[in-house]
Every structure is written in C-alpha cells, then in structure tokens.
Amino acid sequence: MNIHEYQGKEILRKYNVPVPRGIPAFSVDEALKAAETLGGPVWVVKAQIHAGGRGKGGGVKVAKSIDDVKTYASNILGMQLVTHQTGPEGKKVNRLLIEEGADIKKELYVSLVVDRVSQKVALMASSEGGMDIEEVAAHSPEKIHTLIIEPSVGLTDAEADDIARKIGVPDTSVAQARQALQGLYKAFYETDASLAEINPLILTGDGKVIALDAKFNFDSNALFRHPEIVAYRDLDEEDANEIEASKFDLAYISLDGNIGCLVNGAGLAMATMDTIKLFGGEPANFLDVGGGATTEKVTEAFKLMLSNKNVQAILVNIFGGIMRCDVIAEGVISASKAVHLTVPLVVRMKGTNEDLGKKMLADSGLPIISADTMEEAAQKVVAAAAGK
C-alpha cells in the first residue's frame, strides 16, 4: 500500500525526523488558508499523487506571494498529472500539500528497502539527491553507499555517522543526520514498511538536516497490525480493478500489454508472463486465482481482464495441484458464457483431472484454443492477439 507525501511526513514527524511545516489542502480556498497559517514569504505548492517525478510534470511550484499560491493551486488541483511513473494517462490531482519554503544548500538521498539476498534491511544513501536513484546507479554508481542493517542491533550511531559523512554531511550536521537516519529506520521497522525514501534529504544554509520529501510503501500483508496506516489509504489513487479483485481474493495487477493472463500460483503467473514476453507478446495483467478458485472467482477474473479494453486475447494457464482442472474448466466455460467472450481464449491445463477438464472444454462448443505446454500456449496467444 502506498501513501501520500504529506502522510509520510506525518509518520516521519512522529519519529523525530525533521520535516518542513506543511498543511494538506483539498480546495483552492483550503490552500490559501494553509498558506496564511504557515506565513511567508515563500511557499511550495505540491501535487499529492502516488507517483514520483511530480516536479518535472509541473506538479510542484514555488510561490512567492499569496496570489501565486492561488494561481498554482487552481492550476494543479484537478489536473491530469503525467510523470514517468504514471504512464501516459497520468493521475488526477485531488489534493495538495502547501509547505513552507526551504533554503536548500545541498540535496541528499536516503532510502530503506528489504534486501532479498541478505534477507535484512538495506540502507541506501547518496550525495546525489533530488533525482531518480536509478539514474545515479546507471551513471555514478560509486556515489551510492549501501549498508546492511543487523535487525538485532538496528542502525547504530557509528553506522549512521559513517553514512552521513560518506554522502557529504559536514561534521557540524552529522548529529542531525544521525537522528534523521535512525528515525527513518525506526519508522520503517515499526510500521512494516517495504520502502521508506527521503529524496531529497536537504542541508539548509544554516546547517539543518530536513526531509523535503517522503515516500512510503507498506507490506499489505501486515496492514492488519496497523489500522493507523490503513486510515491513510486513498482509493482514488488505486487501480479500480485491483480494488475489485481484492473483494474476491484475487491477486491482480494491471499492466500495459494486450494479453490477459489467468493463472493459479504467483510463480507460475510470473513464468507465464515471462514466456509471453519471450515470444514477443505483452501481458495485460498479473492475475493469480490461487488454489481455491471457484466458478464465481473465475468469472470475476474474466470480467476484470475484459474490463481492460486493450485485451486482445486471454491465456489461462493452470497447474492442477490443489486446484482441480475440471473445476477450472467449469469456471472457464461459465465465465466465457457469462461475459459473452469475443476475444481469442487459449487454455493450457496440467495436473489433477486434466483429461476431464480438457474434455469439458472440448465439449463446450466454445472456440477455445488448446495447448499442452506453456511455450505452445504462449506462442498461440501471442499469435491470436496479433490477429494471426
């Protein structure tokens, strides 16, 4: 689950990480009141969407008067903000953060992620803040410093000080940087976050260390422990299909391709998408129906896939272990009839009651394309999507 910048800063504030004074606003009038409450002479008007690159997309403006605040708030609220993370369709801006201006002397980068190799939390820091860390990694990898944190110990004073100095924090500000880094780690750990990022972490002209931005992602499987985090959820920022899928216990993620995928098991689903890509196709979604799929779940899965107007063909790839192939076949037949399927459908089933499932599909009278291997299924669905 993702949250907005201003919500991330609320979390940081609780963990004693210095952040600028700011007030969220949902209308132009609220933006003006926020600016008046904060006082001038400089404010920053920030679009609040779940995506990075807002500044380059015109979603962050520095205002030097109340009139500027009004103009920028009017322009940004309701706009369809397009960034490198939103895709060409962009995201509608429904809320703003009005924040006091900052005297930026230097921009730094810090983040915490789970390192899958060490199975521990990794702290990444760089002297190159204010830009995408991917760009830094590509062009100046030596400027990224990584520290694997021992969970039984946490981020020690010595480790925090060392990282701070490596990214260019002067000795007079190291203690402040230590406080920010340790606060960020504690926030990450205690909220079950999967990502915590401050970009940029700034040094001001008078030597203060301040988090000028905040990005948090949370492990959805741990949200039951954090009702205060769940309260931050903004459904307007989430994919409508993904919200609908969650109601039926379907793991669904929208993608940019034109081939719908219905698979049981996350590993097989990813392998299926890889194979489609291998043969020149583009998956339109990740969809794992799990091991307890019913006819209702399969029907809802078809509805989800077909709600994407880009879908030109569908691949159903099932391994019948816990899930029986005849149950899936029944669901596929029922779903195809219920949604009046008009796009090509390729089905590959292996495992429990495989022969019965295949017979049910063959006897259904539906124009279903059968395949025996994953490679064959991928080739056939790519060809079908291309109209061949």
Curated annotation (Swiss-Prot):
Oligomer status and interactors: Heterotetramer of two alpha and two beta subunits.
Protein origin, superkingdom: Bacteria
Pathway, per record: Carbohydrate metabolism; tricarboxylic acid cycle; succinate from succinyl-CoA (ligase route): step 1/1
Sample GO molecular function, one term: succinate-CoA ligase (ADP-forming) activity
Ranges where the ATP-grasp domain occurs: 9-244
Family annotation (Pfam families): ATP-grasp_2, Ligase_CoA
Protein family per UniProt: Belongs to the succinate/malate CoA ligase beta subunit family.
Name this polypeptide is given: Succinate--CoA ligase [ADP-forming] subunit beta
GO cellular component, one term: cytosol
Binding site for Mg(2+): 199, 213
HAMAP family per UniProt: Succ_CoA_beta (MF_00558)
Cofactor binding mode and count: Binds 1 Mg(2+) ion per subunit.
Catalytic activity, EC: 6.2.1.5
Species in which this protein is naturally found: Cupriavidus necator (strain ATCC 17699 / DSM 428 / KCTC 22496 / NCIMB 10442 / H16 / Stanier 337)
GO process terms (BP): succinyl-CoA metabolic process; tricarboxylic acid cycle
Matches recorded under InterPro entries: ATP-grasp, ATP-grasp_succ-CoA_synth-type, ATP_grasp_subdomain_1, Succ-CoA_synthase_bsu_CS, SUCC_ACL_C, Succ_CoA_ligase-like_bsu, Succinyl-CoA_synth-like
UniProt entry keywords in alphabetical sequence: ATP-binding, Ligase, Magnesium, Metal-binding, Nucleotide-binding, Tricarboxylic acid cycle
PANTHER family: SUCCINATE--COA LIGASE [GDP-FORMING] SUBUNIT BETA, MITOCHONDRIAL, SUCCINYL-COA SYNTHETASE BETA CHAIN
Reaction(s) catalysed by this chain's protein: succinate + ATP + CoA = succinyl-CoA + ADP + phosphate; GTP + succinate + CoA = succinyl-CoA + GDP + phosphate
UniProt binding sites for substrate: 264, 321-323
